[in-house]
């Protein structure tokens, strides 16, 4: 069966795609008891283990478990985490929480919040032959029907991710004379790309990656910090689910950087792919078109929720286009009406330039898919990368073609993708600078655009992963 993870995770190198029987190890501390002596281990027919002590007593032994955090901290395989993901982050986990809420007293219930990505919404719209707005409203109706309390649109959190990316680029561009690694700035919204960079190129590439959080993780901050305050709840009393086009987002949500130690909770508790939401609809016996639409929820009073919104610049969030327009205006006083893309070797590697009187002022690129990412990294290593900014996505054709999106067996994949792209483009685009509620939250929640609070809640950091060298890794 083909892995649902992005190519950048599957193809890091030959040693990065191995079975857990060879190098999947977890160091554990074994407590030695004084005078315990030698013990035997008995294996039962059901596979359970029992320790038999010298005095004849027995003790059931727990099986060692490798968690998703262990996988992320390891330099071996990533795809062997798939079985862990299915149990830790799946629609079954959401159903367990909803069922527990039904049985619990009101004071013991958790507030369940679902945040839906625009890419997933477009994929579901294509499957059910709906327009994106009806899909958003009917999906809200479905989630509330099964016990979810609030349903948000991650296009709102993407406003913050785009704005922080814009500011970071301008700051780095102005400071490039003082820092060799200031540019190029590489987009950070794709977790498949981030995992690949951390595991394969480590400290060389990480300084180039934008520290701005992805829309999913900004939404995690919004829900578990701002919204929790509004609801007079601690973060652990909220169960936050996101609906994403990509399995790699499950890995992102599980990063230790997005775990609240004080309240022992993650910013995003569970990530469902578009396909998992479709299975949930099937299991509940619900046809999305048959549902009555429900009004969309908004995170704050200043944000409109009458219809879903999106951003210009393609189905992966529009990072290149928004950063390009902002930089042209902020750095050179040039208003860019239309961004013109120049395809290079393939449609997944394109360039954008800003020129004035024959001089190139800005040189941007987008690199989608593992092949183009490898080429980009090699050019960086050779010191021959001409770009100031690169929008990097692990999936060919970007997020609308993510591994978690719905497929149509009776329809060519290219034709389906084009249809999903058209539906995605039907949604009204909104400039993040002008989006209702955004400036209000910067002022009252984050205490300003460049505050310590904004840095803590809207940015993150990356960690180079050293490859472990073990005898098991020897190829005889």
Curated annotation (Swiss-Prot):
Molecular function GO terms recorded: 4 iron, 4 sulfur cluster binding; metal ion binding
Cellular compartments per GO CC: cytosolic [4Fe-4S] assembly targeting complex
Residues recorded as bearing N-acetylalanine in the entry: 2
UniProt keyword list: 4Fe-4S, Acetylation, Iron, Iron-sulfur, Metal-binding
Any matching Pfam family: Fe_hyd_SSU
Keyword Cell inner membrane recorded: no
Binding site for [4Fe-4S] cluster 1: 24, 71, 74, 77
SMART domains linked to this entry: Fe_hyd_SSU
Binding, [4Fe-4S] cluster 2: 190, 246, 395, 399
Tissue: Widely expressed.
Listed GO biological process terms: hematopoietic progenitor cell differentiation; intracellular oxygen homeostasis; iron-sulfur cluster assembly; regulation of gene expression; response to hypoxia
Domain of life: Eukaryota
UniProt entry tagged with the keyword RNA-binding: no
Function of the protein: Component of the cytosolic iron-sulfur protein assembly (CIA) complex, a multiprotein complex that mediates the incorporation of iron-sulfur cluster into extramitochondrial Fe/S proteins. Seems to negatively regulate the level of HIF1A expression, although this effect could be indirect.
Subunit note: External component of the CIA complex. In the CIA complex, interacts directly with CIAO1 and MMS19.
Family designation: Belongs to the NARF family.
The name this protein goes by in its record: Cytosolic iron-sulfur assembly component 3
Organism of this sequence: Homo sapiens (Human)
């Amino acid at each position: 069966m083909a892995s649902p993870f992005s190519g950048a995770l599957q193809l890091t190198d030959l040693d990065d795609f191995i079975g857990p029987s060879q190098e999947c190890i977890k160091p554990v501390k074994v407590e030695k008891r004084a005078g315990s002596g030698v013990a035997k281990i008995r294996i039962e027919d059901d596979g359970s283990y029992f320790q038999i002590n010298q005095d004849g007593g027995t003790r059931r032994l727990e099986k060692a478990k490798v968690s998703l955090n262990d996988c992320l901290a390891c330099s071996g395989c990533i795809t062997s985490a798939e079985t862990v993901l299915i149990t830790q982050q799946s629609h079954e986990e959401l159903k367990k929480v909803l069922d527990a809420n039904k049985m619990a007293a009101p004071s013991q219930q958790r507030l369940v919040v679902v945040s839906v990505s625009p890419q997933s919404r477009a994929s579901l719209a294509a499957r059910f032959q709906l327009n994106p707005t009806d899909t958003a409203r009917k999906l809200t109706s479905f989630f509330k029907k099964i016990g979810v309390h609030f349903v948000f649109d991650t296009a709102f959190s993407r406003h913050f991710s785009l704005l922080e990316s814009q500011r970071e680029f301008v700051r780095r561009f102005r400071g490039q004379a003082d820092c060799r690694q200031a540019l190029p700035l590489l987009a950070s919204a794709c977790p498949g790309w981030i995992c690949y960079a951390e595991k394969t190129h480590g400290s060389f590439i990480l300084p180039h990656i934008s520290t701005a959080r992805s829309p999913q993780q900004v939404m995690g901050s919004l829900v578990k910090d701002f919204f929790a305050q509004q609801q007079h709840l601690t973060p652990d009393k909220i169960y936050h689910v996101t609906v994403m086009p990509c399995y790699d987002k499950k890995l992102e949500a599980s990063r230790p950087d997005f775990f609240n130690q004080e309240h022992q909770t993650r910013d995003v508790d569970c990530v469902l792919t578009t396909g998992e939401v479709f299975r949930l609809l099937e299991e509940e016996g619900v046809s999305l078109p048959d549902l009555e639409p429900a009004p969309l929820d908004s995170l704050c009073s200043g944000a409109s929720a009458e219809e879903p919104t999106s951003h210009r610049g393609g189905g992966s969030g529009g990072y290149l286009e928004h950063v390009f327009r902002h930089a042209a205006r902020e750095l050179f006083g040039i208003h860019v009406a239309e961004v013109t893309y120049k395809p290079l070797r393939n449609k997944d590697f394109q360039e954008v330039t800003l020129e004035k009187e024959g001089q190139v002022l800005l040189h941007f690129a987008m690199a989608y898919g593992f092949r183009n990412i490898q080429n980009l990294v090699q050019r960086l290593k050779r010191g021959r990368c001409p770009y100031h900014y690169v929008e990097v996505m692990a999936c060919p054709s970007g997020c609308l073609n993510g591994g978690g999106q719905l497929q149509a067996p009776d329809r060519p994949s290219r034709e389906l993708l084009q249809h999903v792209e058209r539906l995605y483009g039907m949604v009204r685009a909104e400039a993040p600078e002008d989006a209702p509620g955004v400036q209000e939250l910067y002022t009252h929640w984050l205490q300003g655009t460049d505050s310590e609070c904004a840095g803590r809640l809207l940015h993150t950091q990356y960690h180079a992963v050293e490859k472990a060298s073990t005898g098991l890794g020897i190829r005889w």
